[in-house]
UniProtKB/Swiss-Prot annotation:
Gene name tied to this protein: mutM
Alphabetized UniProt keyword annotations: DNA damage, DNA repair, DNA-binding, Glycosidase, Hydrolase, Lyase, Metal-binding, Multifunctional enzyme, Zinc, Zinc-finger
Zinc finger FPG-type: from-to: 235-269
Physiological role: Involved in base excision repair of DNA damaged by oxidation or by mutagenic agents. Acts as a DNA glycosylase that recognizes and removes damaged bases. Has a preference for oxidized purines, such as 7,8-dihydro-8-oxoguanine (8-oxoG). Has AP (apurinic/apyrimidinic) lyase activity and introduces nicks in the DNA strand. Cleaves the DNA backbone by beta-delta elimination to generate a single-strand break at the site of the removed base with both 3'- and 5'-phosphates.
Coiled-coil boundaries: none
Quaternary data: Monomer.
Note describing how the cofactor binds: Binds 1 zinc ion per subunit.
Family: Belongs to the FPG family.
Residues forming the catalytic site: P2, E3, K57, R259
GO BP field: base-excision repair
Residues at which DNA binds: H90, R109, K150
Name of the molecule in the record: Formamidopyrimidine-DNA glycosylase
Entry EC number(s): 3.2.2.23, 4.2.99.18
Catalytic activity line of the entry: Hydrolysis of DNA containing ring-opened 7-methylguanine residues, releasing 2,6-diamino-4-hydroxy-5-(N-methyl)formamidopyrimidine; 2'-deoxyribonucleotide-(2'-deoxyribose 5'-phosphate)-2'-deoxyribonucleotide-DNA = a 3'-end 2'-deoxyribonucleotide-(2,3-dehydro-2,3-deoxyribose 5'-phosphate)-DNA + a 5'-end 5'-phospho-2'-deoxyribonucleoside-DNA + H(+)
Length: 269
């Protein structure tokens, strides 16, 4: 599933093509996504895009009247087509832009979503979200305060969007490795120093992945069709049985919250 770096990469990829431009129309070939594409999007005509934003794993297109909220789901991606091209099987939604380009949404598994909101303050999709991990609000003090008396394992705890948004399976594993913290420990066992180190590690890993265009494991591609190159820098995720790049110990895999977790038993404590 695309996580924060992949969604931010998508945002940066489409922003130069659509910000300040007019969406002439939306062409919806298959409205049956995770939730049906909202009727306001299907009927969209001649609306100028004021800004392209991101909140958590959602892309937000601010229009003159209303917002388009896009979630990429498990396998969704956005492409910029400078010129029209015939759609393929999994190309479900096009935004036809006044400058001649098309923003095309492709989603083989159809777990993504295209939602409409008149006012983001009333959007159910964005309710109850925690702070952005790259914001000043998210730091070691925040993590330490929230960890008190928590018995759940640190890894699934980090993936709770009410704690911090956008940290999914890949980046939780990678951040815990950088911080030297075992993912199976109880969240309540974090010391204040460890919480600070973990917050810094999350920020560093996410920023580096954004610089590299995200991580391509299967479906994700950048808006220009290139893969995300952070996959070449993964320290533990998807490397079960392979030697740790730091100490040579075989990387182990475990299940936490029914999700695969990867870690080095020597480097993490």
């Amino acid at each position: 599933m695309p996580e924060l770096p992949e969604v931010e990469t998508s945002r940066r990829g489409i922003e130069p093509w659509v910000a300040g431009q007019t969406i002439l129309r939306a062409e919806v070939r298959n409205a049956r996504l995770r939730w049906p594409v909202d009727e306001e999007i299907i009927a969209l005509r001649d609306q100028r895009v004021l800004s392209v934003q991101r909140r958590a794993k959602y892309l937000l297109l601010e229009l003159e009247k209303g917002w388009i909220i896009i979630h990429l789901g498990m396998s969704g991606r956005l492409r910029v087509l400078p010129q029209p091209q015939p759609p393929e099987k999994h190309d479900h939604v096009d935004l036809v832009i006044g400058n001649g380009c098309i923003i095309r949404y492709t989603d083989p598994r159809r777990f993504g979503a295209w939602l409409w909101s008149d006012d983001l303050r009333t959007s159910r999709a964005l309710a109850h979200l925690g702070p952005e991990p790259l914001s000043d609000k998210f730091d070691g003090r925040w993590l330490y305060q929230k960890s008190h008396n928590k018995r759940t394992s640190i890894k699934p705890w980090l993936m709770d969007n009410t704690l911090v948004v956008g940290v999914g399976n890949i980046y939780a594993s990678e951040s815990l490795f950088v911080a030297g913290i075992l993912p199976g420990r109880a969240a309540g066992s974090l010391s204040e120093e460890e919480a600070g180190l973990l917050a810094e590690s999350i920020k560093a890993v996410l920023l580096r992945s954004i610089e590299q265009g995200g991580t391509t494991l299967r479906d994700f591609l950048q808006s220009d069709g290139k893969p995300g190159y952070f996959v070449q820098e993964l320290q533990v995720y998807g490397r079960g049985g392979e030697p740790c790049r730091v100490c040579g110990t075989p990387i182990q895999m475990a299940k936490h919250g029914q999700r695969s977790t990867f870690f080095c038993p020597a480097c993490q404590h």
